[in-house]
Amino acid sequence: GYVGIPMAVAFAEKGVKVIGFDVCKPKIEAYLNGEDPTCEVGTEKLVKTLKGGNLSLTYDLEQIRSANFYIVAVPTPVNEDRSPDVRPVEGASEVVGKVISKGDYVVFESTVYPGLTEELCIPIIEKFSGLKYKEDWKLGYSPERINPGDKVHTFKTIKKIVSGCDAESLDKIAKVYEMVVEPGVYRATSIAVAEAAKVIENSQRDINIAFMNELAMIFDKMGIDTNDVLDAAGTKWN
């Protein structure tokens, strides 16, 4: 999707062997044909990267078994009652659990409530892998910050929050992302802290948009230009 494909291309451009996986066969076939439905990478760069040999794309689960570092970037929509739909995360955890081996790392990027990655994903991965958490494999969380359609603030240009289940995994995960993220990374003190930071980012943006929308409607009824108000208010330093 719009998170996974630019990330896969970015790592491949740095010489990393990347296997992009999606359960949606038509989507993978489109990418292999040089089509980028997300418009985040573009046909020219996608084709060039695929021809470069470092990036392969597949819908065949067995082909990702050889990987040792898994980054999961699945959506987290909401249900009709506005509760989070965690089925994509559950499904991805099952997929990872079926293919990981001892010594592997699993990093989730999906936007979730604090605690979900550890509460939900660990038991599922352990169940399907038969491997013991921390002893056999390590977990991390690094919230995606991509702004769809933004060609300035991209995966490579936005500082990345990273977290791990222990000091060793945090260091490993940080070094992986530092290979491609130009501004570097911020090492969060825990997975829950990283999850909470992402929730705050999204909430702050939504609150600001809603607040300004309300003000704009009020100002419009008063015959006041909202942009003029913002220009005036923006002269204060905070």
Please describe what each predicted stretch is.
Residues 1-238:
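Structural/interface elements that position substrates and couple domains in central-metabolism enzymes
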